Structure formats: structure tokens, C-alpha cells
Amino acid sequence: EDFIRDPLDSEESARIEYDEDTGYSLIIIDLPIVNSTNRRVLSFVTIPLGIIIGNGIVMTVCDAENEFLENFAKQEDINLKFHSRFALEILTTIANHYNRNLRLLNKSRIRIERELKNNITNKQLFKLMEVEKSLVYFLAALKGNDTIIKKLFRLPAIKRFEEDEELLEDLVIENNQAIETTELHQRILESITSSYASLLSNDMNNIMKTLTLFTVLLTLPT
């Protein structure tokens, strides 16, 4: 019961657990979904996805409907016979999903930056901050997932087969690529937001100086 309930908690962190009494294993990983509450700019949050494995059963548990699970379920080559293969396939697909969303975020960042070159406003800076917030969520989730990948085959319910080696290698590469890309985009965004925030602040200071001078001129006796 806990294995089903835990992934439904939005605050649940990525982890692996094995229940000796039932023989079931629980893998909780973080999945990116579009932040539907933010209509100003494309942004993401992450939610827990639970994978329950054991006794010939594989089950996924998630608190929200999402594009990832729908697309994954449509795949014709899903292998449920080998639990290790299924776990690796779903983790690899999630890593690919992060990389795809990172490309979307980068396109959004480039578009906002183009707008900023024409007119520096708080609105555009807030949009960049939303993109930056998405990257913070991504990095925390990807590092948590990386820990899960390293612990995956320590579970008694998941046996490692020779055929899994290539898939595991692909998974590690995809997840590491997502981590490195996220860190790179974070550094770029920090530099951009800092530069434009400074320019906006300077513009405001110049405006205030002009207004002050204008006020002084108005108060001078004629």
C-alpha cells in the first residue's frame, strides 16, 4: 500500500526501496511535465513517477496524467518479461524526455533574449527567471535519477543480464548529457539575467536622475 501511495506525494524524492516481506521493489524517479499554471512562458516542473516491480508484475504510479506515460505505453517493443530491461527502458526514455525539453527551453530562452535586445523590460526578465527555475528543477531531478541509476541493480528483484549492458550504457550517457546540458544552460542564463538586470537598473537610475533634475529646475524661482 505504501508503495502505491508514496509516488502520489508530489514532495516524494527519488529513491529505491525493497520490501523483503512482499518481494516487491519500488523505484521513484522524477519526471518533467509542463507547468500548466504558467501561461506567460514555457516552463516545467517535476513530479514523482513510481515503478513497482516484483512477483512477475510491473506497475507504474503517477499522480498526474502526462504525455510521457501516454507515449511510452504506445510503444510496441516494451519488454515486461525482463524487469531489468523494462526499468532501463523507462529510465532511458525519461532521460531522452529531459533532453528534448531542454532543447525546447533553450529555444524559448533564445526567443526571450531576442525580445530583450529590442526592449529591456521586467516582463522579459521574469520570463527568463521562469526558464531558469525550470532548469533548477531539472538539475535536482536529474541528479536524483542519476543516484537511482547507480543503485538500480542492487535490488534483489532486478537481475542484471548481459544483454542489459548496452542499454545501461546508453542510459548513463543520456542522463549525463542532460545533466551537463542543464548546467550549461544555467550558466548562460545566469550571465544573461545578471547583465540585463544591471542594464535595467542603470536605465532606471538614469531616469530617476533626469526626473530629479527636472524637479529641481521646476522649483527654481523664475
Where in this protein do the model-derived segments appear?
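Long, non-coiled-coil amphipathic alpha-helical linker/lever segments
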Residues: 77-94, 98, 160-167, 171
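A short, ordered amphipathic alpha-helix with a cationic face
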Residues: 77, 100-103, 139
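Membrane-associated alpha-helical segments
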Residues: 56, 107, 111-115, 120-222
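Well-ordered alpha/beta subsegment
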Residues: 85-109, 121, 128
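Short C-terminal domain-edge/linker segments immediately following a structured domain
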Residues: 11-14, 57-63, 82-84, 89-95, ...
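A short, charged helix-loop
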Residues: 66-85, 110-119, 125
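Generic detector of short alpha-helix boundary/capping microenvironments
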Residues: 15-16, 44, 48, 93, ...
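Helix-boundary and N-terminal cytosolic regulatory elements
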Residues: 1-78, 108, 144, 148-160
